[in-house]
Amino acid sequence: MFKKSTSYTKFGLILMKVLDVCVNLMRLVRIYSTVYAIALALLNVTNRKKLLKFYSQFIKKDDLCFDIGANLGSRTEVFLRLGAKVVAVEPQNICMKKLKKKYGSNKKVFLIQKAISDNEGEEELMISDTHTISSMSKNWMKSLKSSDMLLVSTSAFQWQKSIKVQVTTLDRLIKEYGRPTFCKIDVEGYEYKVLKGLSKPIDAVSFEFIPTQEFVLIAIDTIKHLATIGKVMFNYSLGESTTLVLEEWVEPEKISSILLKLPQKTFIWGDIYAKFI
């Protein structure tokens, strides 16, 4: 069903060691987070035109969007440029400070410093200096550590501490802010729990997945849950391709079959798109 990916070459191992030294040096002089944020910003600017074109198929002017796992706001920025209002949800202090600095006075952005789950309350968030991989899923972290993803063997992939964060649900957000046209979810392995907190259809949802056996099965459980909410069709993309792989949207059983046939590659991620009809 799944194929195991190849191991590092000798050159690859040397490269990982060099990168590890660089990461540790940046941490030592306390510039790692800044350098990482700048690199992400440059990548997002380079990719912005493609993102605008891609998301325009889901989002129109004056639509409401949810950005769940907003991080530094790369998708929030795209949604705003498409004319949408955005509820941006992010539990990490370092990210929320940057979001407030950039969007705090923007009346079209509603910033929520919480995480999303299937119930309201309090949960544990594992924090990484590489803030895009902070997670509430210990299984996801374990899978990542044992993967062949680039840089995973370096100290860039560490979770230095854990904090308690307030959590709410998608249903609660909808009650408070309205029904979104599009909901983007990127929460590092916690997507199923997030969508379990949704009980009514919205126009479109995207959620991240990793094509490994464990997480494809979780993605399929997520697909099954969405199918209990309403009539829904699916597509998917890989990495930052901003391209839907399938020419036509397919039903839950078909997308599940497609995902099960993907080769096991933990260094690749993707997004599943669900469209209620």
Predicted regions and their residues:
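Phosphate/nucleotide-binding beta-alpha loop and adjacent structural elements of enzyme active sites
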Residues: 2-277
